[in-house]
């Protein structure tokens, strides 16, 4: 049985309104200079004695450590968590071909990150021998279950595609953990447009030395009357797995012989998409996707002119739907 979960959204991030996020400038933290500390003057003889003593000390005293503001949940001296830490809400998972963050409440990945090169895409592993499976690394009460997808009407959509993990059977099999899976509309999306986008990302390795891709679900609001509402289906019996309204792919590509980074951010609705729809129609500023997802992408890269350029300015952002010769099996 499917149920609908509704929330009143306080932030406008859905549909066309996601563009409104681009006008929201980030507030930089204000630095306040501390007042100078005045110390009484020392007599000259006392200063000379102190300098001589300091020169004789081979080791300096350790600096004063700042007060710890973020407490470890296992800290026995933390009175608020004396009898246990209720978190985390997410599990971090590191696999052969990807890293992932899994949301226990929504039973979906928060994000899945990959690094693609021409070399690591090579291999002969075949998905025909792989099976979807529940992830034992997630505590049992919070796992996505195989039965949740049974007759749900949705495909089990990969965030890290199986075709990106042909290195060996183990790598291929790891992409079938449900922690790498989200419910996706099958016809016209997972088996078509989304699959073509996955091929586009792989093909970038033909013109870039390194390609990094982060994929994940979004839950965006739509306007109803004068309110913005987040609505998404929940599948399973009892209801267990959230059905995202959208999916994002954030791509960073780099050439060894060129300075800087090319970055593209895309957000696609979880519904049938006409193949004639240009990929660029789903292109968004990186900051807009970050605000919608509550995530930071490639934050170690300085975002300024000359360092970061648009991916679609470096390469043609078009999909070749004919490149997906072999259709994904139904439900996958």
Regions found by a protein language model. Name each.
Residues 1-332:
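Domain-level detector for secreted/extracellular nuclease and nuclease-toxin modules, and
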